[in-house]
Amino acid sequence: MKFPVLILNFKAYAEAAGRRAVEIAKAAERVAKELGVNIAVAPNHLELALVAQSVEIPVYAQGVDVESPGAHTAHVALGNLKEAGAAGVILNHSEAPLRLNELARYVGKARELGLDVVVCAPDPTTSLAAAALGPHAVAVEPPELIGTGRAVSRYKPETVVQTVQLVAKHFADVAVITGAGIESGEDVEAALRLGTRGVLLASAAVKAKDHYQKIMELAKPLLK
């Protein structure tokens, strides 16, 4: 996994359904190539294979609930995500929380499959526990700020700084990124100044009227 990175989570937004997911992913890819920065996209499971076939930038799954392919009706298996073209997986988002034993299994299996692994956590202490599982990155996201436009880098900078310091002290090989309420390039720049190695965001990019221009704004701070 390359850093610094901008990860765009499409969630299940109507604005990123079907071919629209490909359009946003291609806008992200265009920005990544023009600036020479790292951008990954996380489309809904329904669009993951289509997006992965359409772009060269990393495509991440938004989550998983089964380790291996098999008789698991209506479930998503890590092995199948790999076959669909996923380069990585986001785990334990506040909108899709996992039990610790599940999280530990999924992190281990994803690493075994060669997938990038990003584990979300709400606070510094939980981030440290997540880092102990061995993901490539921990994304600290206070859930009360997600989708509010109140950027964690401005409204809870102490949470970000504490997480960066705590994880660096005990698990220096695990990167810390952040998210929640990120709306602008200034928010991204502030997050990087706090010591993070990237940002995870959703609505600011997905719901933008001009995806290319918005992603360009959000990605430019990665150059500094």
UniProtKB/Swiss-Prot annotation:
- Asked if the keyword Zinc belongs to this entry, the reply reads no
The record's section on PROSITE patterns has: TIM_1 (PS00171), TIM_2 (PS51440)
Q: Where is the active site?
A: 93, 141
A Pfam family matched by this chain, by name? TIM
Q: What is its main location?
A: cytoplasm
Give binding positions for substrate: 9-11, 146, 181, 202-203
Q: Which family does it belong to?
A: Belongs to the triosephosphate isomerase family.
Self-association or partners: how does it assemble?
Homotetramer; dimer of dimers.
NCBIfam families from the UniProt entry: PRK04302.1 (NF003302), tim (TIGR00419)
Q: What is this protein identified as? A: Triosephosphate isomerase
This chain's source organism reads Pyrobaculum arsenaticum (strain DSM 13514 / JCM 11321 / PZ6)
What is this protein's gene name? tpiA
